Amino acid sequence: MRLLDQWGIEKVEGELTDPASLIRAAAGATLVVHCAAKVGDWGPLDEYRSINVRGLGALLQAVESAGVLRHFVHISSLGVYEGRDHYGTDETVEPSTTGMDGYTLTKVEAEQLVLRHIREQKLPATIVRPGFIYGPRDRTVLPKLLVRLKAGQVKYFGSGEQLMNNTFVGNLVDVIFDVLAKPQTIGSIFNVTDGDPVSKRGFISEVATLAGYKLPQSAVPLGVARFLTTVSEKLYRLLGKKEAPLLSNARFKFLGLNLDFSIAKVRRELGYNPRVTFREGMRDTIDWFRQEGRL
């Protein structure tokens, strides 16, 4: 919010759970980029639905009622795809609703809601599916990873050669602006990554090196990690734990699965050519954490 103030951006504050505030925000809005969500890998499903699905529904109603909308961009996630190894998966593969945590399941449901509005209400919308979004001001994954790297608590799952699905925030913003500038993208879905294959080992090594931390030296066999994840999740749910176990399904997906997704469509239809490589983006990201005293 402070950054928006520095840029002189006019703000209309509200909540996705407060329809009246959404009506105020939607008044006169011709272009809308919806990137708000409850993010996490643990917690009651209804808490995710209240924001990611019902909140989205209230926002759609508000922008449609305003009557001036020209383009709505819904930021989804590559997490909507089935929780398995992926090798070049593209947008022709349907999202999955099985074996999902609350966040990814509600991202699937949110996409379904947007698509229904496209069909039934003629909503002028485009869906963008980024991978793991990283960059300066990250408040979700990297802060936790940096803490564990500093404490020497990170282990590879298997060989660590499984691929990541990184998306630098600046590259994502480029795609969003390109989508908004091209009405022909209405009704389309786009996978978005850096297009720069990086393994789990390469990712973690780069973060650790830039931060000045020791590289992880040990690994957990993939089968063992999967088994421990299943047991940990079941036990934590049985005990009603409020925090995710160290090994959750979402974390296993992040560290254990091969997450290679095709971005051929966004390259072809938008001429997308990522400006920032993974190493450039992560260097800028860790520099920001260092400047903020967060290392």
Language model segments and positions:
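Conserved Rossmann-fold NAD(P)-dependent oxidoreductase catalytic core, especially the SDR/UDP-sugar
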Residues: 58-102
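A conserved pocket-lining segment of Rossmann-fold NAD(P)-dependent short-chain dehydrogenase/reductase
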Residues: 94-97, 127, 147-167, 171, ...
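Glycine/proline-rich active-site loop of Rossmann-fold NAD(P)-dependent oxidoreductases
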Residues: 108, 121-123, 134-144, 170, ...
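Mid/C-terminal beta-alpha module of Rossmann-like enzyme folds, strongest
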Residues: 179-247, 283-284
